[in-house]
C-alpha cells in the first residue's frame, strides 16, 4: 500500500471518528461527511487510474454528484432547523416529533 493510499485512508478514518465523536452540531457533522466523501473520491480515482479501468472512470464523477446532492440537502436542512428552532444541535432534534 503506497503512502498516498495510507494518507487517504487516514483522512477517511479521521473524518469518520470526527463524525462519531463531535456530533453535537449539525455543521460539524456535515463537514465530516464532506471530508469522508472527498477522501473516498480521491481513493477511488487513484485506484481506477492505477488499474487502468477505463470503463469505470465515470464512477468517481457519479460519487461527486451524490456528494453535491448530500451537501445541498444537508445545508438546506441546517437552514431549516436553525430558523425553526434557533440552534443546530443534533442531540436536541427528534425527527419523530415533526
Curated annotation (Swiss-Prot):
A Pfam family annotated for this UniProt entry: Oxidored_q2
Reactions catalysed, as given in the entry: a ubiquinone + NADH + 5 H(+)(in) = a ubiquinol + NAD(+) + 4 H(+)(out)
TM spans (from-to): 1-21, 29-49, 61-81
Protein localization: Mitochondrion inner membrane
UniProt KW Transmembrane keyword: yes
This enzyme's EC code(s): 7.1.1.2
Keywords: Electron transport, Membrane, Mitochondrion, Mitochondrion inner membrane, NAD, Respiratory chain, Translocase, Transmembrane, Transmembrane helix, Transport, Ubiquinone
Topological relation to the membrane, as annotated: Multi-pass membrane protein
GO molecular function: NADH dehydrogenase (ubiquinone) activity
GO cellular component: mitochondrial inner membrane; respiratory chain complex I
Catalytic EC class: translocase
Source taxon at top rank: Eukaryota
BP GO terms, sorted: ATP synthesis coupled electron transport
Entry function: Core subunit of the mitochondrial membrane respiratory chain NADH dehydrogenase (Complex I) which catalyzes electron transfer from NADH through the respiratory chain, using ubiquinone as an electron acceptor. Part of the enzyme membrane arm which is embedded in the lipid bilayer and involved in proton translocation.
Subunit structure: Core subunit of respiratory chain NADH dehydrogenase (Complex I) which is composed of 45 different subunits.
Family recorded in the similarity comment: Belongs to the complex I subunit 4L family.
Protein name: NADH-ubiquinone oxidoreductase chain 4L
Originating species: Mesophylla macconnelli
Amino acid at each position: 500500500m503506497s503512502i498516498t493510499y495510507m494518507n487517504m485512508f487516514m483522512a477517511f478514518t479521521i473524518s469518520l471518528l470526527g463524525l462519531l465523536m463531535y456530533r453535537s452540531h449539525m455543521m460539524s457533522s456535515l463537514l465530516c461527511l464532506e471530508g469522508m466523501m472527498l477522501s473516498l473520491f480521491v481513493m477511488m480515482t487513484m485506484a481506477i487510474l492505477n488499474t487502468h479501468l477505463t470503463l469505470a472512470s465515470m464512477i468517481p464523477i457519479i460519487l461527486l454528484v451524490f456528494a453535491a446532492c448530500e451537501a445541498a440537502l444537508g445545508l438546506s436542512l441546517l437552514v431549516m432547523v436553525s430558523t425553526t428552532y434557533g440552534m443546530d444541535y443534533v442531540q436536541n432534534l427528534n425527527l419523530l416529533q415533526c
